[in-house]
């Protein structure tokens, strides 16, 4: 049964994450970035200053969570497993060149996340408690010209979002934590799973307000720890940095890798694994979306709150 499920998931991965979706994500991001005249990049310093002002931490009654809490809620999904496990798997499967495409998808994805967040704020509504609620499902339902089609698409998005929350939203993180604790401290994976479930339930039952309060204190600590850890790795391996950059650029732009050939776009063999420019792009962009969530619509849900 496990083998059958694995084959089914692999087949779905080949169909969904085909070349068409890779170019659709990058193409949409490039189109929006050019249409906005690089607004996400030009206004990034001003946006950061505004978010970290003292006023940004104060929520207004009836207007949802504060700007800073909204930011930390979104960052909670992007700092962590996606930037650690996602990067590692991208390199193993796609080679060093995958890191370039992960970085590029993150930069281009700024425009995608800006537009989806703006739309979600524009079409958000008030729930029964008088609190703002929004997301792509509300955009599809209220902004789509054909109302019936809009409602159907909204329901489909909500259903797929729930399914995604079990996979990339929970299982990947839970498995990474359980595996790390099991290997390092010999903690049983079942115990870790139960503890994570209980802690998650306590936070979720409080609604978006409780989630925002938890992330407001937790995410800054995560960010500092993550940046400190990556900084230490770079510092201790600084002499290998130039060679690493060369490998990343070569893996992403090697002409032989991008044009392909009888060898199936072979670039290099590392530890018995054949890497190619096409594989680097595929795994770099797909793991990049897992990390930055640009195009998934999740950013708009927290922004609308």
Per-region residue spans from a language model:
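Alpha-helical membrane segments and immediately flanking helix-loop junctions
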Residues: 59-93, 119-137, 141-143, 159-162, ...
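Hydrophobic alpha-helical transmembrane segments of multi-pass small-molecule transporters/permeases
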Residues: 11, 15, 26-33, 70-74, ...
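Membrane helical hairpin/interfacial module
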Residues: 88, 95-108, 115-116
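Helix-loop-helix module between adjacent transmembrane segments
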Residues: 28, 32-33, 105-130, 141-175, ...
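Membrane-embedded translocation segments of transport machinery
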Residues: 213-216, 222-292, 296-299, 304
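N-terminal alpha-helical transmembrane segments of multi-pass membrane transport
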Residues: 1-81, 91-98, 109
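Membrane-interface loop-to-helix entry segments
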Residues: 24-28, 35-48, 157, 174-181, ...
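Membrane-interfacial loop-to-helix junctions in multi-pass transporters
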Residues: 17-22, 56-64, 96-97, 146-154, ...
